[in-house]
Structure formats: structure tokens, C-alpha cells
């Protein structure tokens, strides 16, 4: 199940994603390898990134690697509604709407974590900061985030609890 602004925006998002796929040869090579090797077979991956065409492509590459991918935005102001709709159209559970309130944004993050991910990729640290609270995904074994944006999100005053995964 996805939560996006408007599924009728999907054609525009599909065009953007296709353009990126045509002009990102590094990920294309990785995708080819993942298609053959399926390194993420049987794993659920929650991905919190700026929800736009380049990062949507990353989600598709992870899916080619066998992962069950659940995608959300790491910043409601950078989420592109057409790309979110396109990903939902392509069968990737997507939780992202441009311009939501802080509470709605957190609700989208919570929805994403309901998949009980084995792995978490988090650009800003907001998704990881929810771990350890009442929505802790007990099957998670690792989380990765981009260091600088996550520094504030994961500082002791902002995080919900200690992060229970490496």
C-alpha cells in the first residue's frame, strides 16, 4: 500500500525516472549485476531519501537485487509527487507527499517502518530516529545514513531512544 498525493501524476514521474535510467550508467551496471546475483533476496529494505527521479532509480535497482523496497521521502519539501506516484505505479510501496505538515511527515515515516525492514537506508536520519520507540522494527539488522544531515536528527535531544542497530 502506498500513500502518495495523486496517482494520475505517475506518467510524468515515469518519464523522469526513465530519463535518469537512460543516463546513469553506473547504476545500470550495478542493476545488471543485482539482477543476476539477487544479493537482497528475501530482505525488506526501507529507504528514506529525497524522493526524486535519481533516488527512485536507486529503489528500483535495490528491487532488481531481490529486495522488497519501501520508499519514503527524507524531506517533505523535496518530495516530487509525480515521482512518488510513479514508484507506487511500478509496485514499490511509497510513502511521500510534497509539503505535508511535520506530523503528517512523521506518520509517513511510521508507515514506512511498518514493513519491519531488515535494512534501512536513511539520508537524513529521521527514519532511524524513530527506531527504539513503539514502532521499532525488531527484524532490522543494520541502518545506514548520510552523516552530516543525520547529525542533527540523531542528536540526543531529538532521537526517540538509543538506536538499537549498527
Predicted regions, residues:
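N-terminal ligand-binding/catalytic initiation module
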Residues: 1-166
